[in-house]
Amino acid sequence: MNLEEHLSLGEFHVSNLIKNHISRGSPIQALVLYGGIRRRGVYFPGWVPLILRACACVVPRVVLGKLLHSESIKFGVCSDVMVGSSLISMYGKCGCVVSARKVFDEMPERNVATWNAMIGGYMSNGDAVLASGLFEEISVCRNTVTWIEMIKGYGKRIEIEKARELFERMPFELKNVKAWSVMLGVYVNNRKMEDARKFFEDIPEKNAFVWSLMMSGYFRIGDVHEARAIFYRVFARDLVIWNTLIAGYAQNGYSDDAIDAFFNMQGEGYEPDAVTVSSILSACAQSGRLDVGREVHSLINHRGIELNQFVSNALIDMYAKCGDLENATSVFESISVRSVACCNSMISCLAIHGKGKEALEMFSTMESLDLKPDEITFIAVLTACVHGGFLMEGLKIFSEMKTQDVKPNVKHFGCLIHLLGRSGKLKEAYRLVKEMHVKPNDTVLGALLGACKVHMDTEMAEQVMKIIETAGSITNSYSENHLASISNLYAHTERWQTAEALRVEMEKRGLEKSPGLSSLVLT
């Protein structure tokens, strides 16, 4: 159905269409739809709150939000309490608290949703004092959401006792299952699972979200056993519960369990949705299960599951890691509205497959699409430079991080050090290790040591080993690999006595080489 046909079905139909895009995790599609409508000169005030929600969802699009604010003033609907409250919420979620407060102060009429939006804006941006002031000011007409905004805010500030104190102050009649779940979320999100467990057992009415929240909490701290135990306690399981189980397995590297749960879920009559397939595709990518990945892709097409950015990225990532560049490219080219995450997946895919030049071209294409690269983008494109041996391009891209306001982390430094090392620039790489603002990890130091071995530079290798020995964070497996590398280097440069002495030292430490494992299942 084209845009004209959608418009012919009326404002209510278009509103539902926008809502569906947002609820399915495709706010960009909602913004594209609204843009097409406005280009045709059509305007309906009821759409504004919905589009403002979409603006707050998309890496917040505050510029578009401000344009909507201007349109609201132009069409005389800015004084509408729903529009005003939505503007406050949008500005708050985008970090523009001053603009949110300006809208709040200028509103001729406010309801409890307006106050809640302003309180939530302050709390989400770390201003508990002003939020508390408004909270006390609205004491007569507080509703459940008012209390929840404050409790959530204190939870984000890791002020758990204050959050619990507010929960205890909350009137009994307002303590619905949502309020209980928010307080539980404070414990879970701060990894206080013992406190969460005690609170969870006291919840009088547990819905699917409450059960899944507990499962997610245990999965987050890597306690798969307890998460699974919670799952088996749920009598009436639904899709939310199954999705939590599958996602938790995938996130903890239990790929086979995730795949088994995926098929068991369908066996019990539950149809996968976008969340399900995103998680199971991640499991397929981890375990190299191209056969299952292809089956999931077929299921997506057969059942009409929306290819939102999460599903698209998961498909690209799965095909890339399972060695199917052709299908990864096909999925990418089928995406009508490309996001930063989508381009990141494709750049990583090209880098994995040794297509460094194409990865750099994709990075350049992002600029033409007005997509701002993030830290993941730079890791992907620097990895492509390493694989392709593009030293000058890598140095230029690393410098560009500053202009894009992206602070390099240890992974970015690791890529650059690897690139310098491969190019024989060992002194420059060593200088970077000494000067970088983050502590070098095993991978970074191992990359430099490996480069020393390739270029037969024992003097530099010994300098690197001094850093490794004093780093204080080297695991046995990494120590063995580093020591083995320098021992081999001594042997290659015919320093036999030194090599033998190092081998003896390794034996004294009881270091053994850790075997590696790689798998890929094809059909």
From Swiss-Prot:
Disulfide bonds: none annotated. One of its GO terms (biological process) is RNA modification. One of its GO terms (molecular function) is RNA binding. Pfam families: E_motif (PF20431), PPR (PF01535), PPR_1 (PF12854), PPR_2 (PF13041). Keywords: Repeat. The keyword Cell inner membrane does not apply. Residues 444-523 are annotated as: Type E motif. Belongs to the PPR family. PCMP-E subfamily. PANTHER family: PENTATRICOPEPTIDE REPEAT-CONTAINING PROTEIN. This is Pentatricopeptide repeat-containing protein At3g21470. It comes from Arabidopsis thaliana (Mouse-ear cress). The lineage of its organism: Eukaryota, Viridiplantae, Streptophyta, Embryophyta, Tracheophyta.
